[in-house]
Design a protein with these regions (language model features):
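P-loop NTPase motor domains
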Residues: 3-14, 19-320, 328, 333-336, ...
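Conserved ATP-driven motor cores of ASCE-family P-loop NTPases powering translocation/secretion/packaging/pilus
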Residues: 310-312, 316-424
Length: 433
């Protein structure tokens, strides 16, 4: 299994890893503040070990470091290597999310939900405008996915059926033009129902809804974003069939493209789970196990139903290695105890270092308490100015038991950068290097 750390045994190091068949799931939650060595200490060794096992890996790579250092090595090991590069788009393979739909109505709903949720203000509940814009988006996705060549009657090439196509329709066509297109569709066309619900709103609001949805998709003004989301070169089912290494390179500063990385992982989990059920072994597991190395997890965007996903994908042969800077960051992205459900589904937790009180207190409680023995001594006392020299209080010593945290929060914050804590369900905490 994955290497978690090393211990000094008589002058040489022994590496510690998870044994397979131990009854634990392979989800790992890793906490590490900036500079704590998450990439060097966890991600890179994990990639090397996974390559030995010939398992697939999907790696979030915030600075493109892992792609630069490991992609050639992985190709030499027989891996199919692809990059969905939202940082340096010139060097990206194409991935068109509408190419994953295959006429599935549920997938259309999921794509629309991810886009609306990741382009709304944090903490904002879905209101009238969100719901109306979502119905408009669902209708447009159905319409664009079924666009056909008027001469041959065949579906248009996938690069002409993309989210960029929807943005172009919103920016160049009026509501009357779109109305005419929707009326020309067959009565049983899947775009008609959501468009009909959208039109239940007062007609004087339609223009505002067009503008609102267009604003959510305005990243498609960028020609490179249009290009990498139009062509379809990344197969989301392939990692379950043969060893693949996909690098999703994101910006940890620009959040405007978060909905694309969230779409990538939301559909990836869904496609792999579906493939496992249809083509897996008798237990419904993938032929090739897939590891999701979710570095900078909180900057990927909100993955659809992630707390439910992480609790079910283990049985499909999909394992998540979540890496966050702090528990506070997790709680901000997945509030109201949702983050604790996610952490609770990880049987292994690593603490590489933190500098915030919430994470330190959380890990301190997870480490539990220990019993210590305290000895209290009282020396003999003689009054200073008394002419009588006899002892007033004799020497006393008492011993008692007390409890204290295995590690106080301040001790966790003061851990050396070369140390880490390993917390495994059913085992005592372990401090290693």
């Amino acid at each position: 299994g994955p290497i978690l750390g090393k211990v000094d045994v008589g002058g040489y190091y022994e590496y510690l890893g998870l044994n397979s068949g131990n009854g634990l799931n392979k989800h790992i939650m890793t906490y590490g503040a900036s500079g704590a060595g998450k990439s060097r200490g966890f991600v890179k060794p994990f990639i090397l070990k996974t390559a030995q096992l010939k398992q697939s890996m999907i790696i979030v790579d915030p600075k493109a470091e892992m792609a630069e250092q490991m992609s050639e090595y992985l190709r030499e090991q027989g891996y199919v290597v692809k990059m969905f590069n939202l940082l340096n788009k010139d060097n990206s393979d194409g991935w068109n999310c509408l190419g994953e739909i295959d006429g599935n109505v549920d997938k259309v709903q999921n794509v629309a939900e991810v886009i609306i949720r990741n382009t709304s203000e944090d903490g904002q509940k879905a209101d009238f405008w969100d719901k109306a814009e979502k119905n408009l988006l669902v209708a447009l996705i159905h319409y664009v996915c079924t666009l056909k060549d008027p001469l041959t009657g065949e579906l248009l090439p996938i690069q002409k059926r993309s989210l960029a196509t929807i943005y172009d329709m919103l920016s160049s066509e009026g509501q009357k033009s779109l109305d005419a297109k929707m009326r020309s569709l067959p009565l049983d066309h899947p775009a008609r129902a959501p468009y009909g619900i959208f039109k239940q709103a007062a007609s004087n609001l339609w223009g505002n809804m067009f503008i609102g949805l267009g604003s959510r998709l305005n990243v498609f003004q960028n020609k490179l974003v249009k290009k990498i989301t139009s062509y379809h070169e990344i197969d989301l089912e392939l990692p379950g069939k043969q060893p693949c290494a996909y690098f999703c390179i994101i910006s940890d500063q620009d959040s405007s493209l978060e909905f694309l990385s969230s779409l990538f992982f939301s559909l990836l989990f869904e496609k792999l789970s579906d493939y496992a059920l249809k083509n897996g072994d008798e237990r419904g597991r993938l032929p090739v196990e897939v590891n999701m190395v979710l570095d900078e997890f909180c900057n990927i965007g909100k993955i659809l139903d992630f707390k439910k996903t992480i609790s079910t994908v283990r049985s499909r042969g999909i394992h998540c290695q979540i890496i966050a800077q702090s528990a506070a960051q997790l709680a901000d992205r997945y509030p109201i105890n949702e983050w604790q459900e996610i952490v609770g589904n990880c049987d292994t937790q690593l603490m590489l270092g933190c500098n915030d009180q919430m994470t330190a207190e959380f890990i301190s409680k997870r480490c539990g308490n220990i019993t210590i023995r305290t000895t209290t001594s009282m020396a003999p006392q003689t009054p200073i100015f008394s002419p009588i020299t006899r002892q007033v209080n004799g020497y006393k010593q008492s011993t008692s038991n007390a409890t204290r945290p295995l590690m106080y929060p301040d001790e966790i914050e003061q851990m050396d950068n070369s140390e880490c804590l390993i917390l495994i369900r059913g085992q005592k905490p372990l401090k290693v290097m």
